[in-house]
A protein has these predicted regions:
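Two-component histidine phosphotransfer core
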Residues: 1-155, 161-167
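Short, charged/polar, Gly/Pro-enriched secondary-structure boundary elements
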Residues: 171-176
Length: 177
């Protein structure tokens, strides 16, 4: 197997993400751009975790034009990969979905069928490992920008996987002038 094309893809994706991080200073972007960022992240992690995860999308097409804080999905995807595959003896699938809810909000769901965790043990694990900072940061950024009616909820069950649901207001993205 020739690894040059794989490395080229990885370098290209890393370059793209570095540009998004260092050059572009937009705090809010359209969901379509966030998904593009996420795809580049998955390309990089796919090299590192070869064959350990697969990604499936079910995105409501019209939702791609709505706004989301930049890099809100990447920490959730990172947790799905790192923690979902930790004790897995087979590849996991990460599902990314978007839909509009009845209360005029946009729901973005990242769920995996990985090992999951016991929510009672989460606080102890976070203290020991220093984990959970990215997830807390995503929730705090959403609440700070949109108010406390919006944010992130996480549900997990041992042996079944984890579901992260972002709730955002239904606001069409408008390019900053």
């Amino acid at each position: 197997m020739n690894s040059v094309p794989i490395l080229e893809q990885g370098i290209s994706s890393l370059s793209f993400l570095l540009q998004q991080t260092l050059v572009k200073k937009q705090e809010i972007i359209p969901l379509s751009q966030e998904i593009e960022n996420l795809n580049h992240y998955f390309t990089i992690q796919g090299i590192r975790y070869a064959g350990m995860f697969d990604v499936k999308y079910k995105l409501e097409n019209s939702s791609l034009s709505y706004e989301i804080p930049r890099f809100a999905l990447q920490p959730l995807a990172e947790n799905a990969i790192i923690h979902g595959t930790a004790n897995a003896n087979m590849p996991i699938t990460i599902f990314i979905e978007s839909h509009f809810s009845d209360n005029n909000s946009l729901k973005i769901v990242i769920r995996d069928n990985g090992c999951g965790f016991n929510s009672n043990e989460t606080k102890q694990t976070s203290k020991k490992c220093g984990s959970g900072i990215g997830v807390k940061n995503v929730d705090q950024r959403i609440k700070l920008h949109y108010g406390t009616s919006y944010g992130l909820s996480v549900e997990s069950h041992m042996g079944e996987g984890t579901i992260c649901t972002l709730t955002l207001p239904r606001i069409l993205y408008e390019e900053e002038q």
